[in-house]
A protein has these predicted regions:
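Hydrophobic faces of well-ordered beta-strands that scaffold small-molecule active sites
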Residues: 1-2, 44-48, 74-78, 119-121, ...
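The substrate-binding groove and active-site-proximal loops of carbohydrate-active enzymes
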Residues: 8-16, 44-52, 95-97, 118
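Glycine-rich phosphate-binding "P-loop"
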Residues: 9-13, 78-99
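Acidic-and-aromatic substrate-binding clefts and catalytic sites of carbohydrate-active enzymes
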Residues: 14-18, 50-58, 122-129, 153
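Acidic (Asp/Glu)-rich catalytic clusters
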Residues: 24-41, 60-76, 102-103, 107-114, ...
């Protein structure tokens, strides 16, 4: 079974295909809460994975995610690290540059903003201009940048600081 983050890029997936991960995370929360031997609670907050390029079609998906998580869904993560140089790879997830500039992506992000959900993603330092565009377009959206904007030190950046 692939993770929700890789399912996003599966051509056979649809906008609802990653909801089982949110459901599973919430079930783990309930299990930990009901386990008297366990002294800690897990998954009090859940960050799921969705492809924001579905745009306006994500409204019922987000609503369902909030429902099945009993409000524990706090944000969405999308792996967007991409570079045009084939020597630079982000691992199992193959994506392309420019996704954050796509009008459908922006529409999907607006749904997050409306529902007070954060947008959490990993990009390379070469994509920070896309992040800036999104931040200026959606000033009330909470954006979480992972891995400090992914400084690249291979390919054309090898040996550069």
């Amino acid at each position: 079974m692939s993770s929700a983050n890789t399912k996003i890029y599966d051509q056979n997936s649809n906008e609802f295909s990653t909801l089982p991960e949110i459901k599973f995370a919430h079930e783990q929360y309930l299990d930990s809460k009901n386990n008297k031997l366990n002294q800690c609670s897990i998954n009090n907050s859940i960050v799921g994975a969705l492809d924001l390029r579905y745009g306006k079609k994500l409204t019922p998906v987000i609503e369902k995610g909030l429902e099945i998580s009993n409000g524990k869904l706090k944000g969405i993560r999308m792996l967007l690290a991409a570079h045009n140089d084939e020597r630079i790879s982000s691992g199992a997830v193959k994506t392309k540059t420019g996704i954050m500039l796509d009008p459908n992506f922006i529409e999907g992000a607006k749904i997050l903003e409306k529902n007070k959900l954060s947008l959490d993603f990993w990009i390379y330092h070469t994509q920070l201009n896309e992040l800036e565009f999104g931040a200026k377009t959606l000033p009330d959206l909470s954006i979480i940048l992972n891995h400090i904007g992914g400084p690249i030190q291979v390919g054309p950046y090898e040996g550069k600081q």
